[in-house]
Amino acid sequence: MVAEISPLLKFVLELGPLMVFFFANSRGEWLASTFPVLTEFGGPIFIATGLFMIATATALTVSWILTRKLPIMPLISGIVVFVFGALTLWLQNDTFIKMKPTIVNTLFGVILLGGLFFGQSLLGYVFNSAFKLTDEGWRKLTLRWGVFFLFLAVLNEVVWRMFTTDTWVAFKVWGTMPITIIFTMAQMPFVMRHSVEPLGKDEK
């Protein structure tokens, strides 16, 4: 039987690689002296990038083993991590890993808003099994998330271009996740208002 991932484990699998990235960047010199093999990656940000790729692959593998499927968003994000992480290490240029959130969020935003342009509320295809909304509800929720992803893309560009690498790493871990959680919670009243009533409720 395929197991369902508990919300806590799902949160750990999503946040774990980011925590590894933050720790490896902040303690890069200690890691390099303790595990000399890591110096093959380069400086702290490159060590963090290498371990981030490994942690991401591990999280995706655990998710697959437990559920025999991979959620589309973590999968796409993981692919971009591997591509841009590899470029970062190969060229020894941290610009690529810094642009990864911009690319991922822009991709999600364009896909969602592009779907609306063609009359498709793509968010509904992803979450329809979790909760049911009216067509109008899916359209508006898709629009909100599409705009939010583009906002995150712009915000990432501002932070990595205007601040230090350490500040960007801290923001990536301690800024982006809380902002996303707050935004998600803020959508709950909207989701409740546009939820489809269970069939048969009005027939009693």
Swiss-Prot record:
The keyword Membrane applies. It is a multi-pass membrane protein. One of its GO terms (cellular component) is plasma membrane. Belongs to the YciB family. This is Inner membrane-spanning protein YciB. Plays a role in cell envelope biogenesis, maintenance of cell envelope integrity and membrane homeostasis. It comes from the Bacteria. The chain crosses the membrane at residues 3-23, 45-65, 70-90, 107-127, 145-165, 168-188. It is found in: Cell inner membrane.
